[in-house]
Amino acid sequence: MDFPREFDVIVVGGGHAGTEAALAAARAGAQTLLLTHNIETLGQMSCNPSIGGIGKGHLVKEVDALGGAMAIATDEAGIQFRILNSSKGPAVRATRVQADRVLYRNAMRARLENQPNLWLFQQAVDDLMVQGDQVVGAVTQIGLRFRARTVVLTAGTFLNGLIHVGLQNYSGGRAGDPPANSLGQRLKELQLPQGRLKTGTPPRIDGRSINYSVLEEQPGDLDPVPVFSFLGKASMHPRQLPCWITHTNARTHEIIRGGLDRSPMYSGVIEGVGPRYCPSIEDKIHRFADKASHQVFLEPEGLNTHEIYPNGVSTSLPFDVQYELIHSLPGLENAHILRPGYAIEYDYFDPRALKSTLETKAISGLFFAGQINGTTGYEEAAAQGLLAGANAALQAQGKEPWVPRRDEAYLGVLVDDLVTRGVTEPYRMFTSRAEYRLSLREDNADLRLTEIGRRLGLVDDVRWDAFSRKRDAVAQEVERLKSTWVNPRVLPAHAAEALLGKAIEREYSLSDLLKRPNVSYEALMQARTDEGELLAGPGVLEDDVLAEQVETQVKYAGYIARQQDEVQKHLSHEQQPIPADIDYDAVTSLSFEVRQKLKTHRPETIGQAARVSGVTPAAISLLLIHLKRLHYGSRKQAA
């Protein structure tokens, strides 16, 4: 039967991409339906119980700045918070959180159930309704037809999912869940370009059987305690727990090598390529044969369970080999395994067949987000989900889409990399992928994106008010530092030497003094004149987050200004559109190879064309000349 109500947006799948897509579409004002095979697993953390990390934390902050739920749910569920690279520059500092799986899932479900314009329905989707080249809805496994103007597909690892433990395998979307084989077959019929990838997970351990006395404890950060969301507070956090560290050894490596003949990866059973930056333990032993030991992080899965996630020993080896390798690790000699590790192989679709909005080029109104696009990680999925959900809603409402630029957001880097370069292995975000990472910091994600989110309808009044207060306070303080001047009479030699290491010889603004590498905002604000008055005067920021933002903006102002100059130079051609119907064969000045690559990738802009592998700067110059001729010819005809 046809469901009696029509929707603007249908989201298929309730993982990290699907939940953010549904929430974003609903926040943008679209009547949204989230279809999931199991409402109980909405927001499920299928693999590791952590969120964030280098590059990944930046994406979570951006999702949060755009009104998304991942960061605030993590603040409510996080049982250990750390800032990675805390001793390095602000561009590469990143938040990483251990999360209680149940608390996180509950936090996400509460937001989904209380989001206006959003309906949930429990049914697996077996088919898409397509008329011509336009998607018009989805069909569930009981034949129920839901109609919508747009559909966002976030199928994760469920499309023709195949789980491997040793040489045995069975169909599944993840352990305990069925695969989406019918939907996978339907997508093949639509002739969208696809491939196979794989990912894996380690065996889980009963913490009561671990000897913690021989392990290294890894506590979270306590002073200050980090928060993930710009609206987060440390008081939201539940009870905190430590992680523990052990190491593999020669015996572990010997056990693994002895089992490689029964490994599905090394016996050719698995065809899909695994993630380079999250390799299985057998892959580590094979690729880094000269390394005597590898770290294994024992991460708690939650406050009300003894289950431990041994991060670093993801494996698809037979269970008897898993059993031996776990018991070879110090502290785990008597460990009880609760669940076996496994690898899962699944279909993904070449993201070069997507527009930068994450809409498929072949089927209007159909958007893809998450692992279906060849990415790995909760954070990458959530970011894509938010963008796809927002753009699906905008399209359903007849509005212009939003495409973040590479200089605007890590989300822009992620999407641009996917749609121009494609993937040959699961894609993971790193800060090194961003050319403009000094401007794309965790701490300024809201200053970069919240105004855009407000314009798109993604940011509510509470977030907007908090952001506006922060933005204005930071701007006022930066301006105050620029306009407040001190001279040798006001800052005598002994005070200057204490603050700066030497006396000042002329007049300086407070901003000039703060730019010096050994001067902090806090020290500058505490400096006093001979009369005992505060050098900085009234108006000092007491909020540490705001003070850090001011210090970063002032200290890096010169570098950021130079980077912005670079951005402006690139933007003139970066955003120049290429006609969708361009005939590359008519651009005879281009080599045959370049013409073939451009015909295959069909880039939407000059910037995208420049990032296609094998397309040289000289070829871009020739393409620009051709586009100018086309433009001149069309103007001449119009006249």
From Swiss-Prot:
<dbReference type="InterPro" id="IPR020595">
    <property type="entry name" value="MnmG-rel_CS"/>
</dbReference>
<dbReference type="GO" id="GO:0050660">
    <property type="term" value="F:flavin adenine dinucleotide binding"/>
</dbReference>
<dbReference type="InterPro" id="IPR049312">
    <property type="entry name" value="GIDA_C_N"/>
</dbReference>
<comment type="similarity">
    <text>Belongs to the MnmG family.</text>
</comment>
<dbReference type="GO" id="GO:0002098">
    <property type="term" value="P:tRNA wobble uridine modification"/>
</dbReference>
<protein>
    <recommendedName>
        <fullName>tRNA uridine 5-carboxymethylaminomethyl modification enzyme MnmG</fullName>
    </recommendedName>
</protein>
<feature type="binding site">
    <location>
        <begin position="13"/>
        <end position="18"/>
    </location>
    <ligand>
        <name>FAD</name>
    </ligand>
</feature>
<comment type="function">
    <text>NAD-binding protein involved in the addition of a carboxymethylaminomethyl (cmnm) group at the wobble position (U34) of certain tRNAs, forming tRNA-cmnm(5)s(2)U34.</text>
</comment>
<dbReference type="GO" id="GO:0005829">
    <property type="term" value="C:cytosol"/>
</dbReference>
<dbReference type="GO" id="GO:0030488">
    <property type="term" value="P:tRNA methylation"/>
</dbReference>
<dbReference type="InterPro" id="IPR047001">
    <property type="entry name" value="MnmG_C_subdom"/>
</dbReference>
<dbReference type="InterPro" id="IPR004416">
    <property type="entry name" value="MnmG"/>
</dbReference>
<dbReference type="Pfam" id="PF01134">
    <property type="entry name" value="GIDA"/>
</dbReference>
<dbReference type="InterPro" id="IPR036188">
    <property type="entry name" value="FAD/NAD-bd_sf"/>
</dbReference>
<keyword id="KW-0819">tRNA processing</keyword>
<keyword id="KW-0274">FAD</keyword>
<dbReference type="Pfam" id="PF13932">
    <property type="entry name" value="SAM_GIDA_C"/>
</dbReference>
<feature type="binding site">
    <location>
        <begin position="274"/>
        <end position="288"/>
    </location>
    <ligand>
        <name>NAD(+)</name>
    </ligand>
</feature>
<dbReference type="InterPro" id="IPR040131">
    <property type="entry name" value="MnmG_N"/>
</dbReference>
<dbReference type="InterPro" id="IPR044920">
    <property type="entry name" value="MnmG_C_subdom_sf"/>
</dbReference>
<keyword id="KW-0963">Cytoplasm</keyword>
<dbReference type="InterPro" id="IPR026904">
    <property type="entry name" value="MnmG_C"/>
</dbReference>
<comment type="subunit">
    <text>Homodimer. Heterotetramer of two MnmE and two MnmG subunits.</text>
</comment>
<keyword id="KW-0285">Flavoprotein</keyword>
<dbReference type="InterPro" id="IPR002218">
    <property type="entry name" value="MnmG-rel"/>
</dbReference>
<dbReference type="Pfam" id="PF21680">
    <property type="entry name" value="GIDA_C_1st"/>
</dbReference>
<keyword id="KW-0520">NAD</keyword>
